[in-house]
């Protein structure tokens, strides 16, 4: 998080930031960033701190004597409190001279780009060496040090509580010490609000300054804060340890939870990695592992336990939510922009391997078989070129192979067709013919088939789409011009011609020289010509699918009429049998039904429409213009 510029602040508030003289990591000017090639120049190593500061020495100077009234609630704290030098050394890192971070060439450094905030330019970024990246601090670490107290006071003033705290809780067992329930600024999670109790929480009647927040933040009686200065990592890292203090107070668990949340900053995609604390719970139980320990407190409630041990288990689970940023010997660093993550290198492949296996299986299943052409030979030759063709990339790979498919039959013999079909069916379980255009519909977009238990008069398929369907149903009042699109009369001869043209186009495309073998100057023109041929094949395939649908519709309507004839005939036989029960010389009803089905119904169409279209094409190739379609009359102009 970028630091605010003190140049635009009020003088008293700006002086509070300028009063401290600790020299921490200093970001240099943009001129030095642009001219230096060494990425280590960004940070100056700290000189050894030669003195320690006590909060009593400079407490009034921070306040600048503006809010003296607000100090009354902290008199007891200051009288009973020891020299918390380590806490105040950490606060000095918050309140250090911010002009060192803003010592850049111009005043408009706070632009819209993140490189402006960091003082980096687009050409010479120090974040290019992986070794240096592993040593540089993460944004989450910098944010947790720079933005906790100040940002909480700016964004959450209503949630701050002024509490009289006593470092000796045993002497006052009747009072509960409550921490402030302030949410981190960057957190997107909703914190659990503490239960307001009249005897333990007092609302601040006046605005609370950042210094008061600082005092309350650093005065938890059950915290031990240790800071380790490591110059080799160029940053000062804070390690927070929260030691459990067993009390019979249910509010204590929320105190520890909020104390841990104050030391953690969620920063969107760049979050500080958590480390498990080596604390043995008093009476703990296993909880599901979540990315952050805070989410365990927010999302997971402790398992119920019998007896008085449930309270201790709740305390121990809440205390385990403490976080720390340890040194490099305990965990590996993550880059600021998550370019290099060394922790999950061994975990990610194991997590992704089942997904990759599933994707491989789906790819195998999704590769639809094309009868004859669009073969693996052609795809392996032109794989590199087709990946580079952006114009035809809209049609997916299986569409490209479908575009160049050819019918599984040959005009010479039907036996060749059966042989090719049997071989191809062994290769792939799912087949597609040249007239089956892939629309890439998801199962949710496709119409769901009705189960027999769901059939009724309203959901059964209607008969408005019969051969004369334009004169029935909702299309009765339609008086638009009859075009080729609205003409549902099948033309098997046209479908056969489209298949022959697709076969020729496939041969032309497969004979083209691969783009990778052409010189660079000739590649664009070759791609353009190949895209033209592929687009023509795609259009032909759509026409072929439309013609095949006409053939399917005709066959289904014919089968529908035949089934109605069989049903009406057997119904009449049943009526005759009931009216003349003595006439038993003929065959029984089952035999009559079988005879009707055998004489009336031919090969099944419903559920086997692809096979039906192929049979029609075989008969058309043998010289039958109607393809064996019953009742079809094709005018000579359409042949």
From Swiss-Prot:
Family: Belongs to the bZIP family. CREBRF subfamily.
GO biological process: maternal behavior; negative regulation of endoplasmic reticulum unfolded protein response; negative regulation of nuclear receptor-mediated glucocorticoid signaling pathway; negative regulation of transcription by RNA polymerase II; positive regulation of prolactin signaling pathway; positive regulation of protein catabolic process; positive regulation of transcription by RNA polymerase II; regulation of transcription by RNA polymerase II
PTM annotation, UniProt: Probably degraded by the proteasome.
UniProt entry tagged with the keyword Transcription regulation: yes
Subcellular localization: Nucleus
Organism: Homo sapiens (Human)
InterPro entries for the chain: bZIP, bZIP_sf, CREBRF
PROSITE patterns xref list: BZIP_BASIC (PS00036)
Function in brief: Acts as a negative regulator of the endoplasmic reticulum stress response or unfolded protein response (UPR). Represses the transcriptional activity of CREB3 during the UPR. Recruits CREB3 into nuclear foci.
Sorted UniProt keywords: Nucleus, Repressor, Stress response, Transcription, Transcription regulation, Transport, Unfolded protein response
Annotated region (Disordered), positions in chain: 302-422
Protein name: CREB3 regulatory factor
Polar residues biased stretches: 339-351
UniProt-annotated stretches for the region Basic motif: 523-532
Subunit structure: Interacts (via leucine-zipper domain) with CREB3 (via leucine-zipper domain); the interaction promotes CREB3 degradation.
Record gene name: CREBRF
Biased composition (Low complexity): 310-328
GO cellular component: cytoplasm; nuclear body; nucleoplasm; nucleus
